[in-house]
Amino acid sequence: MDVTIQHPWFKRALGPFYPSRLFDQFFGEGLFEYDLLPFLSSTISPYYRQSLFRTVLDSGISEVRSDRDKFVIFLDVKHFSPEDLTVKVQEDFVEIHGKHNERQDDHGYISREFHRRYRLPSNVDQSALSCSLSADGMLTFSGPKVQSGLDAGHSERAIPVSREEKPSSAPSS
């Protein structure tokens, strides 16, 4: 039996009208709404299924903004409380770590952990960094930029995560 090998360029998720091959699926991800609707999955071919692009986009994607005056990171951490999050700055990097122990949900028990590391621009004032968690679970890490030529104060330190009562003003992806 011959198996066709696809170049990664052809594996791009192009939406519901360009399904991915069954062999390209993410095993262990569970069933999705379109898996339960037979006319969507079998209309084209029984060996094709819809792309998981939307699912991947909805799973904790971060957004980094760096403009003239400030540097901001938005990170979706809706499954974590401020006590579960650790944010620290080390040299030119900000490290965000989240971990919660096993807890029960509607489908059984689940534990989550992630670790993100971002490079800070050299002109970010590290003494004025802040981090907050909105009511809808959006973590916002920000710091002002200083004029070039001034010392931005690089050192290792922890940044406390404060909780906001209002939803985030970050744009939805």
Curated annotation (Swiss-Prot):
Listed GO biological process terms: lens development in camera-type eye; negative regulation of apoptotic process; protein refolding; response to heat
Outline the segment boundaries, as ranges, of region: Required for complex formation with BFSP1 and BFSP2. 1-63
Q: Which InterPro entries match?
A: A-crystallin/Hsp20_dom, Alpha-crystallin/HSP_16, Alpha-crystallin/sHSP_animal, Alpha-crystallin_N, HSP20-like_chaperone
Q: Which domain of life is it from?
A: Eukaryota
Please give the coiled-coil regions recorded for this protein.
none
Q: Which Pfam families match?
A: Crystallin, HSP20
| Residue positions the entry lists as glycosylated | S162
Q: Where would you find this protein in the cell?
A: Cytoplasm; Nucleus
Comp. bias (Basic and acidic residues): 153-167
Q: Does the keyword Glycoprotein apply?
A: yes
Q: Where does Zn(2+) 3 bind?
A: H154
| Residue numbers of N6-acetyllysine PTMs | K70, K99
State the family it belongs to: Belongs to the small heat shock protein (HSP20) family.
Q: Which PANTHER family match?
A: ALPHA-CRYSTALLIN A CHAIN, HEAT SHOCK PROTEIN HSP-12.2-RELATED
Q: What is the name of the protein in this document? A: Alpha-crystallin A chain
